[in-house]
A protein has these predicted regions:
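Non-globular, low-confidence helical/coil segments that flank catalytic cores
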Residues: 2-162
Length: 162
């Protein structure tokens, strides 16, 4: 039989935890315009776009796992989901960080330009295999493609169609 003070402690703890969770949900800052975060990944590129509707788009992920610590500074810890990963071109310093991110984050889809990696290696093959195994759609896009979400429109200007 649980004594009265232990029951009171458990109930009080649950109420505090509930208030904390709802505080995280309702007190987070409201984004009224898109935010762009240029992530420090060392050699390479990575850019996070946060849309007002909470959509997260990550373009490139650098050459290694450094992207994880940069991303953790720009995204809420309780949101391990990225709506769209974009690989601008298949060079290691742009795509390989996704190999690390896929162990920590879930992705809704990936956009690629459809061109082959200049020297495809095990890392590129591993990335494509992991994406496929997880059932994440890979969408091939090129010049002239337009992505629309709510009031946000992104136009693809490269690579030029062959």
């Amino acid at each position: 039989m649980i004594n009265k003070s232990l029951g009171t402690f458990i109930l009080g703890s649950l109420i505090i935890l509930d208030a904390f969770v709802w505080g995280l949900i309702f007190l987070q800052p409201k984004t009224i315009s898109p935010e762009i975060h240029f992530l420090d990944v060392g050699q390479g590129d990575s850019t996070l776009l946060l849309l007002p509707s909470k959509v997260k788009i990550l373009t490139d992920a650098g050459p290694d796992g450094k992207v994880i610590s940069s991303l953790e500074k720009s995204m809420p810890f309780y949101s391990p989901y990225i709506d769209l990963g974009i690989i601008s071109h298949p060079q290691r310093d742009h795509y390989n960080g996704f190999n690390y991110l896929l162990n920590h984050y879930r992705f809704g889809a990936f956009l690629v330009n459809g061109r082959d990696a200049p020297a495809p290696g095990a890392e590129w093959a591993s990335l494509l295999e992991t994406i496929e195994k997880r059932g994440i759609p890979i969408i091939v896009i090129g010049e002239g493609a337009r992505l629309r979400y709510d009031d946000t429109v992104m136009s693809i200007v490269s690579p030029i169609k062959e």
